[in-house]
Amino acid sequence: MRAHRIDTFLIRENIKLEIIHESNSYFGGEHISIAFRFKHLGSQHELFNYKEKLLTVDKAVEEKLEQQAKVQDDGEGTMENQTWSLKSLLGAFKRTGEPEESVDVDNMKMLNESKMLREKIQKQMYFHQPVTLISGYVQISGVFQYDSEVISESKFKQDEVKMVGLDIVPGHTTNSVLALEDGEHFKGKRNLTNYLNSDYTNVTNGLLFSESGSRGRTGTYNERTLMISNDTSIKTLPLLLIPQTLLFSEISLEPGEVRTFYFKSTKLPKDICPSYSSSKVASINYTLEVGADVLSDDNIEKFSNRVPITIAPYISSNAEQYTSRLDKPAIILKTGNIKELKPRLFTRKVSTASAVSFGRRKSSIIDIDSPLEDNEFVKRVKKNFIELVESNQNVSRDIDELIDLQMGVQFGKDEDSSDPEPNDSHFSNEMVTSAESSLRSDAVTKRRKSYSVRDNISNLEQKMWNDCSLVKSDENSNLLPQLINLQNAYQINRNNETMAKVSLSAPFYKTTDDINLVIELDPITTPLLKVTSLTVSLESFEIINPKYKTEGKGIGSKPKGNSVYEKHFICFDECKSVSVKLLPPRSPTNQITGQFKTDVFQHKWMIGLKFVIIAKTESITLDQFYEDKKGILFHSKENLEGEEFTCYVPIPILCTSEDFMGW
């Protein structure tokens, strides 16, 4: 398991490109930092061996030709010394006529074999030859796509805009293969595909993809196939553009050589709209494009590919988020900063366990200048330890968190800067190295580096335990609080009768959390009814602003949810409670989006509960098949039909402070 998400592509058969994402997701108000590693897959040793083989073949041919020429010269000299008579002339023809033809055939055969062997060696050596790359670049763009049959195009202040660099729908394409789980391949020119190391992927690009149909699976998210490209109802508005940034003008890769370039953008706007692709109506997609030209036999082969990047919303320390604006001109940032990372000559091997648990800290002994300061320091450390123990008696906290707090007092904060510049080679090299050497077992890992947004999210849970009020900090700001009037218990009524009680494990969740809940059925208040089955689903809803709705398209109607995860239960006999665990997807390129709000629509999460209710009788699941004086024979019912009752429970889900790694 790697510590970072890594996307891998082959520029050509012997050049591999690795895109190492500094974080996944990127937050509003922070930088986008990515390392690009160009690696020659050949070997200097193999190249030397093939050159030696070529020299051996050429030398063998030359020796054979020289030997044959010498034999011919000796034969001609012998004939000149003989007496010119009719008998000797006939003898000469008998001696030299047939052998010369045989020698020519042998020579041609030998030359052809040598030529074929030489071509074979050259083909094998081609893989290990140096390669020249020119004009390497990187570009980041973002678009908002929507279905104009639901969201009115005329309601936007700006019409659909075409911007150079944002040619996602009709423009730049790459050769790719998109495969489904059933093995069907779609080949040809495709937009925004070739996302991963493999052709097999369920990554989407919003409305460029449509649902491939219900497959009866649970836990799937955004499994879609490419739509017909001439769908005129899909409209696109540009949101973000970081123009092409030159990685290098020209580099030459020797066999086995690795060149790494570190890209860092300017800070993203805090009110940037997050990535969103779980809807059939609207999607927000951010993509990273990287390209280069390859010099090959006096020809230039172009390479370019795109990968999705995930952007999460900015969250303040009071769990506030900005209301993002989609109906505005696109944000154009400055080009990013580029620095080539040189490999270290001598590196110290760091224990995996220590690297995972803690960052590097300052020594507490070095900072002590006097015995008095030593005594004060020890008292402060002891006092902090006692306070942590006392605070843990009321509310149980994670042991790792307690250790971090104690070590923060004893050894100081991490030496790493929370906002490294592009010329910070220590951080950049550490990022690239840890991406290769990390052996962590989870698909999600806590970041060692400290960022303000991540700190804000990490501290929210502790604030909730301490009953801190998370109210709006500034009434005049565009920040909206996300955690208000929280509760983790709900009572479900039907016709003024209590059906069930729902208890959630937490008042709010993050996108990496398991959602645990218990549903307690109430047979006392509904003695004549029985719940025979229960379906629990995690669904995303988007509530479209009426101002932007197409006239006559579901104005006033209830929004429909998009199911992300679903569990089905059958309730036998006297079933009083059902325990449910909902598992949202958590892969590096397949993750859910936390709640957010824009000027066009608002995204929320709900837990859907569908009960199947039947009248309670003596034999609910049995039918009388036969009866005589000896008794009655029952058979179980093949079908059990009942009345459906559906309701929804709101659930706050925010983005996580943890990273989605790669493998």
Swiss-Prot record:
<dbReference type="GO" id="GO:0034066">
    <property type="term" value="C:Ric1-Rgp1 guanyl-nucleotide exchange factor complex"/>
</dbReference>
<keyword id="KW-0344">Guanine-nucleotide releasing factor</keyword>
<keyword id="KW-0498">Mitosis</keyword>
<feature type="modified residue" description="Phosphoserine">
    <location>
        <position position="354"/>
    </location>
</feature>
<dbReference type="GO" id="GO:0042147">
    <property type="term" value="P:retrograde transport, endosome to Golgi"/>
</dbReference>
<feature type="modified residue" description="Phosphoserine">
    <location>
        <position position="357"/>
    </location>
</feature>
<feature type="region of interest" description="Disordered">
    <location>
        <begin position="412"/>
        <end position="443"/>
    </location>
</feature>
<comment type="function">
    <text>Required for proper mitotic growth.</text>
</comment>
<feature type="modified residue" description="Phosphoserine">
    <location>
        <position position="351"/>
    </location>
</feature>
<dbReference type="GO" id="GO:0005794">
    <property type="term" value="C:Golgi apparatus"/>
</dbReference>
<dbReference type="GO" id="GO:0051301">
    <property type="term" value="P:cell division"/>
</dbReference>
<keyword id="KW-0131">Cell cycle</keyword>
<dbReference type="InterPro" id="IPR014848">
    <property type="entry name" value="Rgp1"/>
</dbReference>
<comment type="similarity">
    <text>Belongs to the RGP1 family.</text>
</comment>
<feature type="modified residue" description="Phosphoserine">
    <location>
        <position position="363"/>
    </location>
</feature>
<keyword id="KW-0333">Golgi apparatus</keyword>
<dbReference type="GO" id="GO:0000139">
    <property type="term" value="C:Golgi membrane"/>
</dbReference>
<protein>
    <recommendedName>
        <fullName>Guanine nucleotide exchange factor subunit RGP1</fullName>
    </recommendedName>
</protein>
<dbReference type="GO" id="GO:0005829">
    <property type="term" value="C:cytosol"/>
</dbReference>
<feature type="modified residue" description="Phosphoserine">
    <location>
        <position position="370"/>
    </location>
</feature>
<comment type="subunit">
    <text>Forms a complex with RIC1.</text>
</comment>
<feature type="compositionally biased region" description="Polar residues">
    <location>
        <begin position="426"/>
        <end position="440"/>
    </location>
</feature>
<dbReference type="GO" id="GO:0032045">
    <property type="term" value="C:guanyl-nucleotide exchange factor complex"/>
</dbReference>
<keyword id="KW-0597">Phosphoprotein</keyword>
<dbReference type="Pfam" id="PF08737">
    <property type="entry name" value="Rgp1"/>
</dbReference>
<comment type="function">
    <text>The RIC1-RGP1 complex acts as a guanine nucleotide exchange factor (GEF), which activates YPT6 by exchanging bound GDP for free GTP. It is thereby required for efficient fusion of endosome-derived vesicles with the Golgi. The RIC1-RGP1 participates in the recycling of SNC1, presumably by mediating fusion of endosomal vesicles with the Golgi compartment.</text>
</comment>
<feature type="modified residue" description="Phosphoserine">
    <location>
        <position position="364"/>
    </location>
</feature>
<dbReference type="GO" id="GO:0005085">
    <property type="term" value="F:guanyl-nucleotide exchange factor activity"/>
</dbReference>
<keyword id="KW-0132">Cell division</keyword>
